[in-house]
Amino acid sequence: MILHQGIRYDSKQQNELLDCLEANLNETLAHGTPPLPRIIIDACESLATKALNGLFNEELAGLGFEVGPMAQRIEEAASIMRKESLEAKVLEELGPEYLNDSYNSAILTDNLCPSSIPQLSPAPCRTLTPPYDHGRTLTKQRVPLGVLFHIAAGNVDGLPAFSVMEGLLAGNINILKLPSADNGLSLRMLEELVKEAPELAPYVYVFDTPSDDLPAILRMAGFADGIVVWGGEGAVETIRKFAPPGVKLIEWGHKLSFAYITEQGITDANLKALAHHIIETRQLLCSSCQTVFLDVDPENDGRESANDITMSKLVDFCERFLPILENAVTESVPLDIGSTAQVTLRLYTQTLEDHAGHTDRKIFRGRGCSITLCEEGSPELSPQFGNVLVKPLPRKRLLPTLRKKKSFLQTVGLLCGEDEREELTNLLFRAGIIRVTGPGSMSHTTALDAHDGEYPLIRYTRIVETRD
């Protein structure tokens, strides 16, 4: 289905709607007023309240959401969409003036040296007197990019809709290409949002265009001032190839996250929290733990066989963690048949390689989960769905090992002693990590979260200037 100015259309009408899309966009840009953040915030607040009151439960069940997890997901999504959360987001990323009644409401006059003039001022409008040029004035204003083309990923339910909401908060017109894995949730969310605030209709366009329909995707990209792409390295590389010259490319790529555990951090409470995180997220999120790294340094042990010492400690950890992981599985919703088959095939292949001596890995199998012990290595994607990797990584090798993957790192669940936390946190940040959390909150999200270390609303706007 397609959502075009608040109206649903059949997918067969895609080309017809694309033929008139450029004229619609130009009309809105020429004569429309960018929707104020308060309009979007109030609409999101109303939508969140309805969802919490169960108005969409029956429809969500029809989309395939199970009752237990559905309630938790609704609560998480609603917390991000509440008025207080979105107001805090706009205040943090764009400044208080953006919550006023007009984009042009704040005019500040300053005499500033060049080094003290913000390159990206949070105020919508600033009138400056340049140094050594007191006869002239310079006005800077932050405005929307114009048209954003969102190419969303399907690994998080509703993510495409949230991407559009952020584009709206920055005042942009938004064209969304739904991912193939989308179950219809994003279109329904945006449809309801437009019903709450009909003035948003000219700012939201949703297409369920297949990824192999390159001509249609190229047309949408040609209308855009910025392309927002969510996805893995392959998807981002493809977008780079067909993006029109000069268009701003905003990449929110797939990332790797892991747990780092010191000897002081190996406690039952920490391991239980980590296990529940792994099982609850099914390791499908960028913030999900794929690998557990242990701070094992055999050289400090004073014995001869360093490798034997390391492997012994890793095996001890795996044998301790596996039953904890199994307990988390028993408290979770069972996997669907397709996911179970996929994991079983991966582990069977790994077992055959183990027996053939083609791998340095050992699998500890549990009920509905597994731990794969690796002798060494860097962050990588696990088999997912409760099947985690365990590797040694002494803290002295932490930075050089992680720097090799610096562009793909996101969250670390840090399990350590309090006297170690500050040192390790700073070391992880220097290695390229974006977020350090406790073991159970790696995937906890709020409206104030940055995307890959950057604020999206700033990236969805630009600075314009006028001079007298």
Annotate the PLM regions:
Residues 39, 43-50, 192-199, 324:
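Generic non-transmembrane alpha-helical segments
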Residues 148-151, 175, 292, 410-414:
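Short hydrophobic beta-strand segments
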